[in-house]
């Protein structure tokens, strides 16, 4: 998501900041800014749009100083405008800060701060921290940051500078932050590429770390002020490898980014006490009688998951269409139909054409989109952004889980708005949704087990994926991932359909991946597993942690944490992504750019 750079040393800070931000452009952004400590005080320049606009503005008013912070922003709270760009400052302009992540409780903090006389100049969640720092600062910048962070809730990487201090202070929780160690200078960045021209000796900060950087050294403590030690490492990555975060492929990096992507998708939107979500939509849920989901590929499976949730939680009739077929079937549409278009890129031509057909017939429109400024964002009435950040790997991973989370948010929003979802059940769902980032982190720890399963089955010529209810789309997505990057033939079916044809394929050579997490249809899924075993099939089960029945039936079991059955696909798809990845690597495939595929399909 956002790019962060900080510098204290002997060089021209402006040059270091702009160079570092350029090296983080691959993360995506819609505005940029820097703050430099000059002899005249702290000076801030920020612009919406590309870095070139910022560089041009800085060129007109050069900032001379050897300490500064810089930021590229991917908008979450507030439009991509100059006032909403970072850095943000205290009202007296003496403290500047940059922030990656989301402060979930910013609205209540903002109301309290305004009641105490603070005046806000932006629409961002970040600015609340600037005002909190104004209250907590009493001469020690690091202590002021620690005290201010006690009030906020959410994911963050924060970097702060003060015009009276020859130091930068920073803190992180969930959002990444790395320290670069130099001689007579030190650096901060959200990712290693920004540091490579200056140093290869780095410290990776951990959750809860708070750091003070001066020219002479680095001091790290926890949020309570207790000293902590972080081991310095030498990175030998090329720039390309650094952009991959040290992972061998973008796809694997993006799989591992899913916990903080979910933080971004959900952050600031959950209102557990009220049992609702804040989506900022102009749409009135009571004016919609039916939904038409229009999407392609991975996005279409997220849409199918959305269909299950919209009908279950909101009692809202929902049709699901592959976008390339939608406009050719002459769909029945009226003014109370909502066309729900889902696309990572916002440029998928079949989705755009399907949306245009629905609008031509009078439908309302809502886009679930990752890429801001895309064609789809301009053609829909309302947008629900998934905030997944740039996805480089052709095979979608983090955008898919973000889309699933967005579908869950939308279903709760419709359910509460239409009076179909009880307060207690909504609160339960929202509490479970808040756990999702941590649960996905737990699943990622299972990678060695998934790699072992991949080793056993990577020579198979065919795979079958089975799932029921909300896990049927998970099966479809698992099969698609395997096909896309390993080139192994894979099919997916609702598990109850197996006996209506696919069962003829089952023999001792066919691995069958079964989504068998706990839920209302668990026992029926066990029966399907027994049917596979009776015909010699090899079962790879995705099961709920603690399930003692599954190991008696399946050759291989990959456990995922227990979660609300309607949210199980968000944790269950992760081992399927890893399985596809590990098999493709074993087969020597080009994981990030598989043959014949494009990231964004812009031709019919």
From Swiss-Prot:
Record-listed E.C. numbers: 2.6.1.16
The SIS domain, residue ranges: 281-420, 453-594
Subunit-structure text: Homodimer.
Chief place where the protein resides: cytoplasm
Function: Catalyzes the first step in hexosamine metabolism, converting fructose-6P into glucosamine-6P using glutamine as a nitrogen source.
Name recorded for this polypeptide: Glutamine--fructose-6-phosphate aminotransferase [isomerizing]
Catalytic activity, reaction form: D-fructose 6-phosphate + L-glutamine = D-glucosamine 6-phosphate + L-glutamate
CC per GO annotation: cytosol
Organism of provenance: Thermus thermophilus (strain ATCC 27634 / DSM 579 / HB8)
Gene: glmS
Keyword terms: Aminotransferase, Cytoplasm, Glutamine amidotransferase, Repeat, Transferase
Gene3D superfamilies according to UniProt: Glucose-6-phosphate isomerase like protein, domain 1, Glutamine Phosphoribosylpyrophosphate, subunit 1, domain 1
Organism superkingdom: Bacteria
A single MF term (Gene Ontology): carbohydrate derivative binding
Cited InterPro entries: GATase_2_dom (IPR017932), GFAT (IPR005855), GFAT_N (IPR047084), GlmS/AgaS_SIS (IPR035466), GlmS/FrlB_SIS (IPR035490), Ntn_hydrolases_N (IPR029055), SIS_dom (IPR001347), SIS_dom_sf (IPR046348)
NCBIfam families: glmS, PRK00331.1
Pfam family for this entry, one: GATase_6
GO annotation terms (biological process): carbohydrate metabolic process; fructose 6-phosphate metabolic process; protein N-linked glycosylation; UDP-N-acetylglucosamine metabolic process
Subcellular localization(s) per the UniProt record: Cytoplasm
